[in-house]
Structure formats: C-alpha cells, structure tokens
Amino acid sequence: QYKLFENHEIEELRLLKNQGYCNENYLLKSEDKQYLIRKFKLQHDRKLEFKIQQLAYDKNIAAKPLLLDEVNGLMICEFLEGKHKSVLDEDDLQKLAQVLRNLHSIHLKSKPLNLKNALSSKSKEIQEAFVILEKYEVEEVLCHNDLNPQNILFTDEVKFIDWEFANLVDRYFDLASVCVEFDLDNQAEKYFLAHYFNTDEEIYNEKLTAHKTIYKALCTQWFESL
C-alpha cells in the first residue's frame, strides 16, 4: 500500500528475534533493499521521533527514516546491520563518546524533558540528587535518553536506534546512562569522559553521579509500569 514499495518485489517479512518494549520490529526484504518496520505498542510523539531520527541520520548516527504512518501506527526506516555489545573496550568507548558528542551538537527546537516531573519517586536519594543538580548549570542538548546496549549498533561506526525517548535534556543524562548500562568501572568511565569532553571543559563527577541516580530510578519506574 506504500509508494515506497512500488515496483519492488517483497521477498521476506519476518518478526525480528530482538524486540524492544515499545515496538514490534519486522525485517522486510525486497530484491535490493532491507527495511525495518516498527509497529508501535506505546503512545509517543512519533512526529517528533521521526524528525529527530532524520536529524540524527543527517549526522550519520541513525538509520534513514523513510515513512511514518500514524494511522496504522508504524514507522519504516532503512535496516541497519551491526552488533550489540554488553562490554566495551577502549576503542568502543572512544567511538561511542565521539558519536554522542556528535548527537549532542544537533540543534532542535522542542519542549525540554523535565526529569523531576517525569519521576514519580520522591525518595530521599532522588531529592538529594536534584538538590545537587541545582548547583550546576543545565547543559541542555538533544539526548537519546535510552542508551541501553540494545539501542547501540557497532560496526566500523557506531549508530543509535529506537529514538522514541529522545528529547532535550542535560547532556549528563546520556553520559550517566552509558556509565550505568555498561557498568563502567572508574578507569573505563574516565576514559569515556576524557574522549567525550574537550580538554578545556571541566568534568563534574558529582553532577554525573546525580544523573546516574535519576536514570536508575527512571528505569525502575518504567519497567514497573509495563
């Protein structure tokens, strides 16, 4: 039914083994191309997601988005080959830091994500984390906000997939999510941050720790809501 597939013979359509929580993912093969079809399970601002993925594609860090069908609740984009990793070596960390820096340079006009409003937990630990953050300037950039290993593809390059949570927020939130998701030890964390930040930029470890606390709490809240 889509012009995208006119004059293309569909050879295969299959449900992918690796599935996300927010979408059903299908691989569609034509005679000369492979596509990812994402059937939405949850409500999100999909127009914003499509726009952000296009901006990220322009920076060579995402699959090319091809079609958004809000009526049928699906998005089609180019299929990316790559490997998911749960453990990162120095080369991976360096590449990931550079791609993240690239993402954070993208200009987007949007209403920023309010982390405090997003969290239902008002635990002492969470409150203390937000008190710490009040001491620091908010460095608002376009963040992916869901950098778990299943959303990062490694080949010669690094690319991100599943952009539904992407929005403007402090860049330390993405940095914290990488540190948490890959369980980086002190040495790996220092190496990662050293390749993300410019030499003239100060690294605020206290701010990073506060964002780790908030990220973990948001993950817990999200999984409990499923």
Segments predicted by a language model, with ranges:
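Conserved protein kinase catalytic core
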Residues: 44, 84, 152, 168-170
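Active-site activation/catalytic loop segments of kinase-like enzymes and analogous catalytic loops
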Residues: 173-201, 214-226
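Pre-DFG segment of protein kinase catalytic domains
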Residues: 142, 159-162
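An alpha-helical support segment within catalytic cores of ATP-dependent transferases
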Residues: 1-7, 108-145, 149-150, 155, ...
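ATP-binding pocket architecture of kinase catalytic cores
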Residues: 15-111
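All-alpha amphipathic helical-bundle segments outside canonical DNA-binding/catalytic cores
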Residues: 202-212
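Conserved N-terminal boundary motif of the eukaryotic protein kinase catalytic domain
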Residues: 7-16
